[in-house]
């Protein structure tokens, strides 16, 4: 019996090989297999958003004007979520709600589910693109792993949170002012700023900004040759012929500043990767908790004492009152379909307001 060792070669290329050759060809803009998911989804998501913000009203879903056509600007235009009565319907154009009528589909909020779902798959396609290119050029896939952070936040906020609530209605609409309203909603109804997962997210994002600034400045500092250039404005001249980067010099500098410093490039850069990605993932987990209506910290003893003693007040009790105000005034106008009417005596009052 003879065993042949060596690379297996096909006599002729099949359809997969032809597709693979074309998709992964070296060109100005790499396509790849991931591009089959990324490019159509990104095109439809961005195109749907521009269409919605330009032409489509939110009168039938939120009682609002939300398009340039109605007088909104870039900060106030939005692609709004469907009405609460539509619950978690995918709102397919050919579905039972719109029945193939494009105008009716837009009025019902179909563009929101269109943008949200294509946007989610577009982001996933972009992460797969980074995996594919890393594999092609023999890199480790840390870029793709890092990009899982933004994907986790997008999916948790725009998809998982409303799935835990009564409908897509409670997701953020796609617009600047709409996102601000959603943030106020999160604070008033979930006390989001006192949620430990939000705290970890803030620490991760702001900590990453600090680390990025420190790292960029340190590398810039050590890219220039020794000499009098360090003491004059010539130190800011970017035309030096070759870099003179020195990890040892940077380590010595920060050792003197803080008493401790990174001595290993890999650990340093992994830390700069780890801080923001972990922060984003923690935020995403927190939003999943909110989908299930899990509560933030409650300091009940302070609330009881504040209720009993008019002279006792903390920043926490003031914020709790403020949240009650947000709920009372926001719910009535934010959910007009509920016909909520709050009599004057139940509206919150106190020093916080």
From Swiss-Prot:
It catalyses: 2 a plastoquinone + 4 hnu + 2 H2O = 2 a plastoquinol + O2. The modification Phosphothreonine is found at residue 2. HAMAP family: PSII_PsbD_D2. The keyword Secreted does not apply. One of its GO terms (cellular component) is photosystem II. GO terms for molecular function: chlorophyll binding; electron transporter, transferring electrons within the cyclic electron transport pathway of photosynthesis activity; iron ion binding; oxygen evolving activity. Belongs to the reaction center PufL/M/PsbA/D family. A plastoquinone binds at residues 215, 262. It comes from Guizotia abyssinica. This is Photosystem II D2 protein. CDD domains: Photosystem-II_D2. PSII is composed of 1 copy each of membrane proteins PsbA, PsbB, PsbC, PsbD, PsbE, PsbF, PsbH, PsbI, PsbJ, PsbK, PsbL, PsbM, PsbT, PsbX, PsbY, PsbZ, Psb30/Ycf12, at least 3 peripheral proteins of the oxygen-evolving complex and a large number of cofactors. It forms dimeric complexes. Photosystem II (PSII) is a light-driven water:plastoquinone oxidoreductase that uses light energy to abstract electrons from H(2)O, generating O(2) and a proton gradient subsequently used for ATP formation. It consists of a core antenna complex that captures photons, and an electron transfer chain that converts photonic excitation into a charge separation. The D1/D2 (PsbA/PsbD) reaction center heterodimer binds P680, the primary electron donor of PSII as well as several subsequent electron acceptors. D2 is needed for assembly of a stable PSII complex. The chain crosses the membrane at residues 41-61, 125-141, 153-166, 208-228, 279-295. SUPFAM superfamilies: Bacterial photosystem II reaction centre, L and M subunits. The D1/D2 heterodimer binds P680, chlorophylls that are the primary electron donor of PSII, and subsequent electron acceptors. It shares a non-heme iron and each subunit binds pheophytin, quinone, additional chlorophylls, carotenoids and lipids. There is also a Cl(-1) ion associated with D1 and D2, which is required for oxygen evolution. The PSII complex binds additional chlorophylls, carotenoids and specific lipids. Keywords: Acetylation, Chlorophyll, Chloroplast, Chromophore, Electron transport, Iron, Magnesium, Membrane, Metal-binding, Oxidoreductase, Phosphoprotein, Photosynthesis, Photosystem II, Plastid, Thylakoid, Transmembrane, Transmembrane helix, Transport. 2 of the reaction center chlorophylls (ChlD1 and ChlD2) are entirely coordinated by water. Pheophytin a binds at residues 130, 143. It is an enzyme of class 1 (oxidoreductase). It is found in: Plastid, Chloroplast thylakoid membrane. Pfam families: Photo_RC. Fe cation binds at residues 215, 269. It is a multi-pass membrane protein.
């Amino acid at each position: 019996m003879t065993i042949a060792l060596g690379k297996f070669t096909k006599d002729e290329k099949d359809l997969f090989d032809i597709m693979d050759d074309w998709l992964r060809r070296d060109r100005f803009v790499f396509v790849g297999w991931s591009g089959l998911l990324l490019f159509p989804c990104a095109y439809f998501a961005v195109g749907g958003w521009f269409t919605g913000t330009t032409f489509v009203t939110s009168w039938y879903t939120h009682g609002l004007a939300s398009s340039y056509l109605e007088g909104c600007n870039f900060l106030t235009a939005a692609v709004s979520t469907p009405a609460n009565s539509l619950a978690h319907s995918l709102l397919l154009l050919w579905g039972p709600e719109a029945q193939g009528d494009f105008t009716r589909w837009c009025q019902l909020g179909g563009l929101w589910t269109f943008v949200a779902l294509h946007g989610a798959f577009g982001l996933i396609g972009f992460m797969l693109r980074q995996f594919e290119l890393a594999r092609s050029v023999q890199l480790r896939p840390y870029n793709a792993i890092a990009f899982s952070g933004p994907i986790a936040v997008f999916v948790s906020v725009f998809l998982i949170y409303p799935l835990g609530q009564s409908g897509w209605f409670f997701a953020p609409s796609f617009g600047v002012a709409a996102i601000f309203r959603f943030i106020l909603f999160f604070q008033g109804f979930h006390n989001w700023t006192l949620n430990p997962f939000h705290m970890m997210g803030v620490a991760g994002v702001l900590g990453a900004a600090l680390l990025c600034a420190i790292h960029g400045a340190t590398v810039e500092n050590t890219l220039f040759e020794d000499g009098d250039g360090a003491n004059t404005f010539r130190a800011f001249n970017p035309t030096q012929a070759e870099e003179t980067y020195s990890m040892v010099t940077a380590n010595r500098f920060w050792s003197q500043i803080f008493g401790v410093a990174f001595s290993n490039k890999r650990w340093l850069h992994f830390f700069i990767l780890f801080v923001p990605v972990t922060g984003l993932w923690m935020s995403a987990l927190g939003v999943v908790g909110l989908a299930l209506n899990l509560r933030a910290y409650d300091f009940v003893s302070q609330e009881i004492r504040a209720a009993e003693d008019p002279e006792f007040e903390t920043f926490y009790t003031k914020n709790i009152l403020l949240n009650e105000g947000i709920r009372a005034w926001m719910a009535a106008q934010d959910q007009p379909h509920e016909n909520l009417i709050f009599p004057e005596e139940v509206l919150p009052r106190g020093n916080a307001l």
